[in-house]
């Protein structure tokens, strides 16, 4: 039974989202109960008509018209009540799933950066989109259908016991068999449904990977190989789906129809034990009608069992994201004043990797100084910058900002005072103004001043709508250098105390590099500046250059001091000088 999920705890958590809509839910249930009752009363009227009017040949027109009118009113009432309950349940479902989706999205936004390093993005997207849509079925389809079916079963059984309790006992025999079928279905369907949800997320992940890497795929003619990768996941999803369908086809409708036929045969067998005339024709008609009606909610319940299992499995995946550990930040909300950094005995390794990426790092960076981290690929430069940003929790050692442990500083203070410009900046499909402010309440005049600082004001003025001009998807109407300048402008409007540039000039032309150099010269007076350098020519004026090799500090000093040592930095600088 280990492969079964904790059904009731997950269902209970999902139903909590319906709790704020209690009044609507009660009204919907009243409509549902009234509609089901109206639906069941019809055969009783017909039974009365057969027994008391038709069989006795007392065809009074007024009585017949009254029965017909009542029957039509009951059917119309049933239709309207079922319509209104359906509208209410759908409204509750949409509002509940909207809240659930917001919670899932919030949980995704609160995930530690390390989770995005190890978890496929497609899996997370699937939890926010596909899985929440599967849970929606619980609110707008499964819940109302199950409740309506259960109400119908009880009302039909009550009516059957009222008419003839011997025959009703025979009909009651079907219920334990149905419960057995549902338990067997749950046992075999749960692991299959898990696979279905997983493979669907895998398809999303591989498709996302393919779209993002389309340039490389087409450049190296790898379309067929990536098509095969998606096809493999799609085939696995298809096979798991087919197993579910075969299980549905065997355990649900056909088996229930067979059970109903067996009950009908039992009725016929039961008749042989009663004397002729013991049953009225109207009662017999009502029982046969109710048996057919009883079959419908039972089939509906077993069919919804499949949808319910999908919703529960989707809920399990959603809550695995919501309940996943969040990165812990401190509670100190005092703003940083100087931007002084002190790194003491820091060693670090990523999750699922026992080898240290950084080992025994000790650095002191004074306020408003210009420091550069250099080293070959894999030396630990970006990891060290990410630790200063507070992206990863420290395992060994301490980092102090303004003599306060980074673990004690609140998330809002950390994000406001320590900012980073990455090598591949993110540009949103929105206006230039929004891309800089990101929704923060920043005056337009201040934004223009920052644009002047980063030498982008002329570009923005040349655009049709100026600062409110729309940028294309991922900033496709901007050059790489312009994106970098925009990213620098984005962080400068916040006046950070510590600014980190992670190889921000690695992929740009020399002209844009000079603009960025001018920008850095103008802002270094206001904040502590840390640059992860690819081009060593950009850090010649740094107050201190720290050379990393295999996660260790091997050299530090000014540009001139390191050249004098003629060691690692000297070799790197000479190599680049000869290269250019």
UniProtKB/Swiss-Prot annotation:
InterPro entries: AAA+_ATPase (IPR003593), ABC1_TM_dom (IPR011527), ABC1_TM_sf (IPR036640), ABC_transporter-like_ATP-bd (IPR003439), ABC_transporter-like_CS (IPR017871), P-loop_NTPase (IPR027417), Type_1_exporter (IPR039421)
Stored NCBIfam families: PRK10790.1
ABC transmembrane type-1 domain segment(s): 25-310
A GO molecular-function annotation: ATP binding
Catalytic activity: ATP + H2O + xenobioticSide 1 = ADP + phosphate + xenobioticSide 2
Xref: SMART domains: AAA (SM00382)
Domain of life: Bacteria
The protein's name in its UniProt record: Multidrug resistance-like ATP-binding protein MdlB
Pfam family, one: ABC_tran
Lineage, broadest ranks: Bacteria, Pseudomonadati, Pseudomonadota, Gammaproteobacteria, Enterobacterales
Record's keyword annotation contains Phosphoprotein: no
Gene: mdlB
Subcellular location: Cell membrane
Membrane topology: Multi-pass membrane protein
Ranges where the ABC transporter domain occurs: 341-575
GO cellular component assignments: plasma membrane
Keywords: ATP-binding, Cell membrane, Membrane, Nucleotide-binding, Translocase, Transmembrane, Transmembrane helix, Transport
Family affiliation: Belongs to the ABC transporter superfamily. Drug exporter-2 (TC 3.A.1.117) family.
EC number, as in UniProt: 7.6.2.2
């Amino acid at each position: 039974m280990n492969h079964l999920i904790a059904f009731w705890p997950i269902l209970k958590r999902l139903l909590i989202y319906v709790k704020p809509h209690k009044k609507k839910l009660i009204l919907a249930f009243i409509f549902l109960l009234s509609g089901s009752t109206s639906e069941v009363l019809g055969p009783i009227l017909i039974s009365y008509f057969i027994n008391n009017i038709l069989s006795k040949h007392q065809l009074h027109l007024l009585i017949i018209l009254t029965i017909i009118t009542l029957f039509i009113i009951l059917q119309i009432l049933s239709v309207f009540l079922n319509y209104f309950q359906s509208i209410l349940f759908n409204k509750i479902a949409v509002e509940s799933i909207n809240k659930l989706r917001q919670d899932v999205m919030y949980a995704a936004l609160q995930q530690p950066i390390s989770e995005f390093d190890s978890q496929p993005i497609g899996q997370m997207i699937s939890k926010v989109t596909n899985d929440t849509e599967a849970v929606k079925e619980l609110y707008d389809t499964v819940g109302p259908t199950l409740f309506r079916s259960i109400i119908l079963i009880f009302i039909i059984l009550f009516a059957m016991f009222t008419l003839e309790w011997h025959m009703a006992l025979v009909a009651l025999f079907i219920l334990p068999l149905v419960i057995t079928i549902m338990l067997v279905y749950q046992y075999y369907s749960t692991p299959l449904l898990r696979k279905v949800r997983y493979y669907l997320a895998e398809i999303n992940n591989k498709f996302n990977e393919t779209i993002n890497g389309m340039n490389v795929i087409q450049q190296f003619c790898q379309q067929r190989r990536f098509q095969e990768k998606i096809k493999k996941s799609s085939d696995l999803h298809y096979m798991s789906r087919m197993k579910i369908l075969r299980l549905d086809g065997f355990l649900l409708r056909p088996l229930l129809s067979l059970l109903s036929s067996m009950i009908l045969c039992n009725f016929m067998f039961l008749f042989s034990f009663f004397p002729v005339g013991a049953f009225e024709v109207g009662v017999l008609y009502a029982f046969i009608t109710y048996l057919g009606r009883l079959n419908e909610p039972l089939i509906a319940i077993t069919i919804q069992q499949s949808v319910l299992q999908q919703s529960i499995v989707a809920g399990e995946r959603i809550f695995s994201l919501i309940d996943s550990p969040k990165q812990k930040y401190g509670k100190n909300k005092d703003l940083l004043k100087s931007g002084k950094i002190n790194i003491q005995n820091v060693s670090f390794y990523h999750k699922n990797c026992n080898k240290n990426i950084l080992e025994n790092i000790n650095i002191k960076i004074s306020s408003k100084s210009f420091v550069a981290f250099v080293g070959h690929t894999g030396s630990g430069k970006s990891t060290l910058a990410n630790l200063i940003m507070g992206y990863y929790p420290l395992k060994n050692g301490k980092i102090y900002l303004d003599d306060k442990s980074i673990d004690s500083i609140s998330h809002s203070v950390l994000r406001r005072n320590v900012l980073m410009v990455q090598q591949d900046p993110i540009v949103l499909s929105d206006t230039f103004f929004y891309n800089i402010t990101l929704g923060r309440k920043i005056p337009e005049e201040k934004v223009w001043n920052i644009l002047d600082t980063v030498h982008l004001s002329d570009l923005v003025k040349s655009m049709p709508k100026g600062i409110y001009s729309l940028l294309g998807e991922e900033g496709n109407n901007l050059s790489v250098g312009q994106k970098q300048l925009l990213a620098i402008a984005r962080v400068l409007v916040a006046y950070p105390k510590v600014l980190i540039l992670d190889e921000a000039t690695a992929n740009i032309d020399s002209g844009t590099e000079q603009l960025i150099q001018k920008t850095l010269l103008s802002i270094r007076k206001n904040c502590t500046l840390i640059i992860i350098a690819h081009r060593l020519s950009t850090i010649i004026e740094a107050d201190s250059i720290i050379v990393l090799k295999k996660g260790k500090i091997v050299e530090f000093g000014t540009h001139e001091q390191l050249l004098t040592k003629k060691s690692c930095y000297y070799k790197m600088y000479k190599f680049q000088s000869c290269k250019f």
